Amino acid sequence: MQETIPDSRGRFGEFGGKYVPETLMSAIEELEAGLAKAMVDPAFIGELKADLAEYAGRETPLTFAKNISAKLGGANIYLKREDLVHTGAHKLNNAIGQGLLAKRMGKNKLVAETGAGQHGVATATVASRLGMECKVFMGVEDMKRQELNVFRMELLGAEVVPAETGSRTLKDATNEAIRYWVSHADDTFYLIGSVVGPHPYPKMVRNFQRVIGDEAKQQMAEKTGRLPDTIVACVGGGSNAIGMFYPFLDDEVELVGVEAAGRGLDTAEHAATISKGSKGIIHGSLTYLLQDESGQIKEPYSISAGLDYPGVGPEHAYLAAQKRVRYEAVTDKEALDALALLAKEEGIIPAIESAHALAKAFQMAKTMTPNQSVLVCLSGRGDKDMHTLQRVYKEGYDE
C-alpha cells in the first residue's frame, strides 16, 4: 500500500491531484522537481535529521499514562509527546523540512497560512533560523482566539496578515496565502501546514511528519515488546494523524482518526468532514469537504482553531474509502472533559486539538482489556489555549 500512494499524478485512488490554475503550474512543477532531488540527497537528509534532533528536540518521548490507565481500568494508554517539540506541537517537523527545501531551491521568503497559530509560529521560527523573510496569513477570527500566537509570530520577525474574507478563519487564510504565492512565486516558497493542497504537498508533508510514527513504532516495541492494538489521532487537515498512521498502515493495528463534532453532528456547527462531508475540490485537491447542495463550502465550527477546516487531506479521504482508518467525531464538551482529566491525572495540559484524540482514546480504552494498549498522538500542548480554557472552565461551556 505504502510505496505506490500517491501515484505519479498525486492521486490517492480517486482523491488528491493538482487542481490549480495555469498560473501556479510552473511553481508546483518546480517544487516537485526540487523535492524529488532533495529526498535522495544524503546531505539534505542529514541536515534535516540534525535539525530535528538539535533544534526541534527529537526524538520525543513515549509516556505511559499510568494514572488514567488505572482509573479507566481498561487498556494501557501511551502518549506520543509531540507537545514537547520546540514551539509546542508537531508542526515544526514539517516546517523544518520545507524550510530547508525552500533554502535549497534558492527562495528567500516563506509564506504560510495558519489556523490555531501553531503552524504560523513554526514557519516564523524556521524563517528566523534560516534568515528568511516570513509572511503568515491568519483569519481575523483565529487572530482573536489565538492572540498569544500572533504576538509570538511577530516577536519571531514574521508579518501576520489578517484574512478578512468569508468566515475569516483557516480556509480564508489559505485562499489569501495561495493568492499571494501566485504573484510572488519567483522568490517565495509556500509552506503548507498540513497534508492538504495540490500534489506534491500532501505527500511531502506526510513524509516530513512520518517521523512521529516511525519513532513511536520503535518506542512501543522497546517499551511493550509489541505494536499497539489501537492508535488514535485528531484530524483537521490531518498531518499529525498521517504522520502517526503511515508507518503502521501495513500492520494489524486499528487506526482511528478523530474529527471535531463541535456542538454535535446533528447541528450545523461541526468540522467533521469525513463523517458528514461529500466529495469536492478544495485548495487544489479532490477530497471530502463540507459543502451545501450547490457546492458552496459550509463554514466549519470547532472550539479548536486547528480543527475547523472544511476539507481534509486527500490521503485521509482515501484511507476512509478503503476502510483502513476509521474516522469518528468528538464534541467540544467531550474534548474539554478529556483535557481536564489529563491535566488532573497526569500533569499534562494538551492542546484542545489533541484533547479530541484523548477523548476517543479514553472512551475506547474503557472497553478494552489491561493486556491491550492504545497509543495516542498528543499533537500539541495547551499553552496557546489558556484564554479559551480559562473562560470555559470558569464561566462554563456555552452549549
Curated annotation (Swiss-Prot):
GO cellular component entries: cytoplasm
Top-rank taxon: Bacteria
Catalytic activity: (1S,2R)-1-C-(indol-3-yl)glycerol 3-phosphate + L-serine = D-glyceraldehyde 3-phosphate + L-tryptophan + H2O
Uppermost EC category: lyase
Disulfide bond positions: none
Modified-residue entries (N6-(pyridoxal phosphate)lysine), positions: 91
Molecular function via GO: tryptophan synthase activity
Cofactor: pyridoxal 5'-phosphate
Keywords from the named record: Amino-acid biosynthesis, Aromatic amino acid biosynthesis, Lyase, Pyridoxal phosphate, Tryptophan biosynthesis
SUPFAM superfamilies xref list: Tryptophan synthase beta subunit-like PLP-dependent enzymes
Pathway where this protein functions: Amino-acid biosynthesis; L-tryptophan biosynthesis; L-tryptophan from chorismate: step 5/5
Assigned EC number: 4.2.1.20
Annotated PROSITE patterns: TRP_SYNTHASE_BETA (PS00168)
Assembly, per entry: Tetramer of two alpha and two beta chains.
Recorded family membership: Belongs to the TrpB family.
Reported function: The beta subunit is responsible for the synthesis of L-tryptophan from indole and L-serine.
This protein's name: Tryptophan synthase beta chain
Organism this protein belongs to: Shouchella clausii (strain KSM-K16) (Alkalihalobacillus clausii)
